[in-house]
Amino acid sequence: GLVSSIGKALGGLLADVVKTKEQPA
């Protein structure tokens, strides 16, 4: 559903932010 898609998108964004913090480019 829509909520599930939004949750997945937010989860992906959070994962990217955490990755960037742990391993600065």
From Swiss-Prot:
Keyword Secreted carried by entry: yes
Tissue: Expressed by the skin parotoid and/or rostral glands.
InterPro entries (UniProt xref): Frog_Litoria
Gene Ontology BP annotations: defense response to bacterium
Chief localization: secreted
Alphabetically ordered keywords of this record: Amphibian defense peptide, Antibiotic, Antimicrobial, Secreted
Cell location: Secreted
Entry GO CC: extracellular region
Family of this protein: Belongs to the frog skin active peptide (FSAP) family. Caerin subfamily.
Function, as annotated: Antibacterial peptide, that adopts an alpha helical conformation which can disrupt bacterial membranes. Each caerin displays a different antimicrobial specificity.
Name of the protein in its database record: Caerin-2.4
Organism lineage: Eukaryota, Metazoa, Chordata, Craniata, Vertebrata
